[in-house]
Amino acid sequence: TSTEMLKGYVLSKISDGKKRNEINDIWKQQIQLLHGYDKNASQSFFHAWFRGKYAVSIRPGKAGSENQDFELIGTRFHNWFRDSHQALFGLKNSDSFYTFFKEKFPFYVKWYLKCWDARLKFNPNMPHLHYIQYWGIAESLQDPMLLASLNHGDHEEQIVDKIDSVARFIETFTVRRSINYKKFGQT
């Protein structure tokens, strides 16, 4: 899978064996958490994380246009990461790979899964996440928007407010379009 190929690439960039094993253990733990929700959750997570935080381009609607970041992440995100990790992620050496995947990977998995939980079971701190379960747009669009608002290092209260604000926007957007008989699909 793309997730396993990404893991292999990331681990190959960490030269210290002890640090490589630590990231391997973190990776296994995080992927196991994701797969506890759905067998495809790891791929959906990487699509959402990379699109939300690092994609800088999207294919124009013209016929014959080349795929850009958004589409490339959706098809082969491991190749996109390999080609983009220096420019977009700032990962230039073994230590930067280690630090990035030790700190940011678990952070974004945690909040991706908290969003998943709040969509399924009402959370009074993030009520609009539950509402967009019924009035939202495709998860492939809403999940990147939710993660895009987060910054590693934000306080939990800030994060909850940001997520709920984005979910409120999505809900407002879809409800307004719906009651005005306008489409709000993926295209």
Language model features with spans:
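Flexible coil/loop and intrinsically disordered segments
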Residues: T1-T187
